[in-house]
Amino acid sequence: EDIGFKDNLQSINKIIKLHNLTNFKNKKAFINKFYNKLDLDFIIKILEFSNPDKEKNSSYFTDSSISIDILNNIPILKGNIRILEPSVGSGSFLLQLIKKFSHLPSVQIDVFDIDTEILSLLKLLLKKVKLPKNTNINFFNKDFLSYTFKNSYDLVIGNPPFGKIKDKKTLNEYKKHGININNN
């Protein structure tokens, strides 16, 4: 399995270098050119690995297998639901959430990210994905850790930027109320 990932990572790095994908405009052009030619998960991986600010923004992206494990461990929800994705990044959780809840009458998803460029790229990707009619997405270019929420949510799911949380009490609260798939 490591060999496959290593080969995949080498391919991703070659693509990033070949298309100069550390540049925002080049990423947009890449999405427009290759959206129908490459697997969507592969494009998302390319966006994740080409983010030059990932260290600064504590942008550590979640592998799709972990996202799937987390989604498989959430409770069954019915009716109209509201979901918060506090650190959406390039949308790997978001796309899986949309699929998982496509059968419900109404799904309202609020997504947050501090990276303006990654949100713009995510919006471009979502224009190319046929979203179910039941799904509405609101984008917030804000740090959810300092945002004052007016709504409650049925589900909060994602991989928040724990590296940014310096206060141990706050970090412990997030860990206490979250799901850790390693010890469920």
Name the predicted role of every residue range:
Residues E1-H103, D110-L125, V129:
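Class I S-adenosyl-L-methionine
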Residues P52, V88-Q108, L119, N141-N184:
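SAM-dependent methyltransferase catalytic-core segment centered on the flexible catalytic loop
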Residues N80, S106, N134-N136:
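A generic structural signal for alpha->beta connector loops
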Residues R82, N134, K168-T170:
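Short linear functional motifs in flexible/disordered or boundary regions
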Residues L124-Y147:
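S-adenosyl-L-methionine
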